[in-house]
Amino acid sequence: MTTSKINGPVVFKKNGEIAVLTINNPPVNTLAKEVRISLASYLESANQDADVLAIVICGSGRNLCGGADIREFNTPDREVQPMSRDLMNLLEESKKPIVAAIHGPTLGGGLELALGCHYRVADKLASIGLPEVQRGVIPGAGGTQRLPRLIGLQPAIKMITSGLPVDAIEALKLGIVDLLSTNDLLEDSIAFAKQIIANNSGPRRISTMKIEGSLEENIKLIEKHRLQLKKSAPGLSAPTYALESINNAVIMAFDEGLKAEAELSRISMGSDQSRSLVHAFFAERQAGKIPDISSDTILRPIKKAAIIGAGTMGGGIAMSFVNAGVPVILIETSRENLANGISRIESNYKTSVKRGRLTEEEMAIRLSRITASTSYKDMGDSDIVIEAVYEEIDVKRNVFKEIDRFSRGDAILATNTSTLDVNKIALFTNRPESVLGTHFFSPANVMKLLEIVRADRTSKDIVASVMAMAKEINKVGVVVGVCDGFVGNRMLAPYFRQCDFLVEEGAMPQDIDNVVEEYGFRMGPFRVSDLAGLDISWAIEKRRAETRPLDERFSPLLDRICQLGRYGQKTGAGWYLYEGGRKAIPDPVIEEIIYARSHEMSLNRRIIEDDEILQRCLYSMINEGAKILEDGLAIRSSDIDVIWLHGYGFPRHRGGPMFYADLVGLRNVCDTLDEFHREWGDKWQPSGLLRSLADSDSSFGEWDKKQIKK
């Protein structure tokens, strides 16, 4: 006989002697306060019901449970009883055995829920993990205490401090789950529960288990991982807190460890790093929302792409499409250039095979999706045509005339320009409404960011279709407006300019790189420039020189270095020296050039403190970001953060430049800019938006909310 109660976010059903509790809180069954309350209530009912001998907990929709509701972080709702950790204890203390039926992504509090149960059955497609460190926090509902007891210290440390999930097969090997479902998950879980009853197995509580290994061995293992984290996660607090909590599982009784975990979880949740990582999480999801474009806009299907230009960028773009299963026609003007482009793509794939990231068969399949051609006529059946040729307006004009002539009438026409005016390029065609910018970042097959440049006449369905395409080819798309450098590179310019000025005034390239890397960037500005190639920046600077005001401060250091043929790593020398490798070595030649420039300017070189270096680097880009918002070239300040997180290596645990400004306080940022303005002139004058927000004690985050309401 089956009875049920279907009200609320948890559905209660009796299937004979088995009580089935189904979490029903779409879209991902988070442990919101209503779910916790309902689960606790039905758990008590099932334990008091003499007809119920075992309990199965499952989830409706796409998964068992998506863990904590991130919207409850730092809100009173998170404290509503039972809190998640108390709920897991209630589950474990149940007198009747509980089986968790795991399917879909069962992460964070979802896995902790399953660990609170006595047994676990998983669907073969389930993914299981504790990703909290990726949000700047640690598991706070028993995960750091139960998982090491269940599967051993080494695998638990790996899972918890990395935040990476495992698949169901690996979970079975590790001992996280007891059975993989081969048919219907719920039926198999009920059958498993009946087997437990038949065997009189009873509840199996992880809290009573001992961690494998001696105390001395386990403490040594913890210490080994402490040292590793200093190298693998520099500056990140959450992995360190997580390891400390795991260490407590080794040296403390379960209840003590649980209390200590709760305290470490509280500390991590209140940290700037946690706030920054949560901001990044939501910012990425907001970036796909374009206020004036309806979510039900009819999209143009993109089943085939044409890429014009088989250079490094064009080849990388082609790889992005074929990696996602989209066939590509790769077009070049000469057979030699085409052959070189295909060879470069093959070489990239062979490297992936060599490193175990692809199989030979997968490489062959991806290469088979590329058709090479020297004729524009072959783009005729492509849904999107992306131009990726030399960054010169006359070259673009000629290419777009051909694209306009030979592409299909309803095709999307895109330019990969990083600096040129997309509005001008659109007018090279007879259908400017079909033209937009798709600014990929190099290497395009690796970098996640795609700036989607909306020109004045670009139609809404074109923008929406390319935003959807970005997701399909595993990119993070952000819509931006037309200006020199768009959003990311426009902000990069004042940042690099300040780096040059700091060098003229007293710092050395390695001083600036070290400060920026200590802040969290993987590479400082001078090392990045050497890696990218100084000739690229030099070409852009020469183009901009034509319109630069005569009274504007300008550093000729890049000119002088490039005039020596020093273009960075590829020539063995740039800002640094490279002796047969990639290690950047400070070079006396560069020091001489810098000292000569300081002398030429009659500057008395001085010791520049790290704080000043960091403020001049970051505040220059923040101020430019505020001007971009004023100009209407980005929809939200959080979109700017996403651009810098995915295109420029801004440290994720800082949230992005605009969110970092909010953390520092816009009043503090504005006051510092005023000081710099008095010292160095108008380029440092705070933007009107920044000053307005500072004067009203507001933030970029609050400004974003107001834009959404408009």
Stretches found by the model and what they are:
Residues 16-24, 34-76, 89-103, 123-127, ...:
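A structural preference for short, pocket-lining loop segments at secondary-structure junctions
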